[in-house]
From Swiss-Prot:
GO terms for cellular component: Atg12-Atg5-Atg16 complex; autophagosome; mitochondria-associated endoplasmic reticulum membrane contact site; phagophore; phagophore assembly site membrane. Keywords: Autophagy, Isopeptide bond, Membrane, Protein transport, Transport, Ubl conjugation. Involved in cytoplasm to vacuole transport (Cvt) and autophagic vesicle formation. Autophagy is essential for maintenance of amino acid levels and protein synthesis under nitrogen starvation. Required for selective autophagic degradation of the nucleus (nucleophagy). Also required for mitophagy, which eliminates defective or superfluous mitochondria in order to fulfill cellular energy requirements and prevent excess ROS production. The gene is ATG5. It is a peripheral membrane protein. Transmembrane segments: none annotated. This is Autophagy protein 5. It comes from Chaetomium globosum (strain ATCC 6205 / CBS 148.51 / DSM 1962 / NBRC 6347 / NRRL 1970) (Soil fungus). Conjugated with ATG12. It is found in: Preautophagosomal structure membrane. GO terms for molecular function: Atg8-family ligase activity.
């Protein structure tokens, strides 16, 4: 069973990732490119030796959206996913790929019976939190009509970039400048961190980061990283001890943070970066 992908390259398309610099690629807006990227999956059931379920899903989608199809396919309860015996959290597929860096594609996962996920509530709450971080309140998202609120989540389910953009512009085009940029940095844990770190675990660093420096110049990614994690990022200009991955590829430290958020945030509004040690 399969769904043909629009593109199975799970990396961020751009000059920083070594993607081809073709006229058509250069003319495609980055958000549209990101919405078109897909991740191929090879899913087996923990309690049944049926043929694997093969499918490609958008980077911006969620594994939980596959559960009805998987339950019907295997005829057994399906509610949780594992990668190498690590239970996966309810995060966007692309972010999970960046976190766990599967050695090969399709990504081999095991589905089974476990904790159930309410993905719609998870997405909505995360989007509200991002709105609060941006503006100091959640008035923008709370003022959306029920129709627009529903359309936002439906667009994620349907991987509909055009419909999503119509609603998302209402959230990003505010009368006042943003107070902060919603940013989360995911740092893989190791036994050396605590002595007993769970395999596959990670910690999330989330600070209030202004899109502008005190001199009103744009805040860059490098400056934000140095401010949030100075031990890992002693330089604001270049990666020295660690780098960050966004949508499968590195990002220039000189990138303006607000512009990066507007162009490459996940649909819930968060700029999610994964640390990779050098």
């Amino acid at each position: 069973m399969s769904s043909p992908p629009a593109s199975t390259d799970h990396r961020l398309v751009g000059s920083t990732t070594g993607a081809p610099d073709t006229p058509s690629a250069a003319a495609t807006p980055l958000p549209q490119t990101l919405w078109s990227l897909q991740v191929p999956l090879h899913i087996t059931h923990a309690s049944k030796s049926t043929a694997p379920f093969i499918v490609s899903v958008p980077r911006f989608s969620y594994l939980a959206l596959l559960l009805p199809r998987l339950t019907a396919y295997y005829g057994l309860p399906c509610s949780s996913f594992h990668h190498e015996e690590i239970q996966l959290r309810n995060l966007a597929v692309g972010l999970l790929v960046d976190l766990y860096q599967p050695a090969t594609l399709p990504w081999r996962l095991v589905v089974g019976d476990g904790p159930e996920w309410d993905i719609a509530d998870t997405f909505t709450n995360s989007a509200k939190e991002a709105d609060f971080v941006r503006n100091g309140n959640a008035k923008q998202i709370m003022s959306l009509s029920k129709e627009h609120s529903t359309a936002l989540w439906n667009a994620v389910q349907d991987n509909d970039h055009v419909s999503f953009g119509k609603v998302n512009r209402r959230l990003l085009n505010t009368p006042s400048p943003f107070k902060n940029v919603p940013i989360r940095i995911y740092i893989p844990s190791s036994p050396n961190d605590t002595g007993d770190a769970t395999p596959g675990s990670f910690k999330v660093v989330q600070n209030l980061v202004s899109p502008r420096l005190p001199n009103r110049a744009p805040q860059t990614l490098g400056a934000a990283l140095k401010s949030m994690l100075p031990t890992l990022f002693p330089s604001s200009r270049d990666p020295v001890l660690a780098n960050v991955i966004l949508h499968g590829g590195p990002v220039p430290f000189r990138a303006p943070l607000e512009e990066l958020m507007r162009e490459a945030a996940y649909p819930d509004g968060w700029l999610c970066l994964c640390v990779v040690l050098l």
